[in-house]
């Protein structure tokens, strides 16, 4: 499993904080950030890498998280969540089988961002009654 991470200019500093944290937690990271990328481009790059392997997860950071979330939800088969708290990050994996989260550097601080990332990457899909919803999401295009 790889954690694919990317950021636009507004999210660069926080991306490095999250990236360093996850690397210290022994996760394999793939950073697709390129200089001057808009949130649309970076979200598409993260999604492309996430979709290479079923177990891959993605994190996109910009100023507010809303833009990358909107882009991610346009990608067929991508279940994404915009999060700004640890519980939502964990639960979106458990109940929605989300493969990508977005967050805003102007909304969350360093410690909260690390905890959000930790909750997301450590979350496990519960399946069962949640699968009906996940199937519905995956059929949307």
Curated annotation (Swiss-Prot):
User: What EC number(s) is this enzyme filed under?
Assistant: 5.3.1.26
Keyword set, alphabetical order: Isomerase, Lactose metabolism
Q: Does the keyword Cell wall biogenesis/degradation apply?
A: no
Q: What class of enzyme is it?
A: isomerase
InterPro entries according to UniProt: LacA, RpiB_LacA_LacB, RpiB_LacA_LacB_sf
- What Pfam families has UniProt attached to this entry? LacAB_rpiB
Superkingdom to which the source organism belongs? Bacteria
Q: Give one GO term, molecular function aspect.
A: galactose-6-phosphate isomerase activity
Kindly list the biological process annotations in GO that this record carries: D-allose catabolic process; galactose catabolic process; lactose catabolic process via tagatose-6-phosphate; pentose-phosphate shunt, non-oxidative branch
Q: Quaternary structure per UniProt? A: Heteromultimeric protein consisting of LacA and LacB.
Q: Which HAMAP family match?
A: LacA
Q: Which family does it belong to?
A: Belongs to the LacAB/RpiB family.
Q: What is this protein called?
A: Galactose-6-phosphate isomerase subunit LacA
Organism this protein belongs to: Streptococcus pneumoniae serotype 2 (strain D39 / NCTC 7466)
According to the entry, what is the taxonomic lineage of the organism?
Bacteria, Bacillati, Bacillota, Bacilli, Lactobacillales
């Amino acid at each position: 499993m790889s954690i694919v991470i990317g950021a636009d200019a507004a999210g660069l500093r926080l991306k490095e904080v999250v990236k360093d944290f996850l690397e210290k937690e022994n996760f394999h990271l793939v950073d697709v950030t390129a200089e001057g990328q808009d949130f649309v481009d970076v979200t598409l790059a993260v999604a492309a890498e996430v979709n290479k392997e079923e177990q891959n997860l993605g994190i996109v950071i910009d100023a507010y998280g809303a833009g990358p979330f909107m882009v991610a939800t346009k990608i067929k088969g991508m279940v994404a969540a915009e999060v700004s708290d640890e519980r939502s990050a964990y639960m979106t994996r458990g109940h929605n089988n989300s493969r990508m989260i977005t967050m805003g550097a102007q909304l969350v601080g360093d410690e909260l961002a690390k905890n959000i990332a930790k909750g997301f990457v450590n979350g496990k899909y519960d399946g069962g009654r949640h699968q009906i919803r996940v199937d519905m999401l995956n059929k949307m295009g």
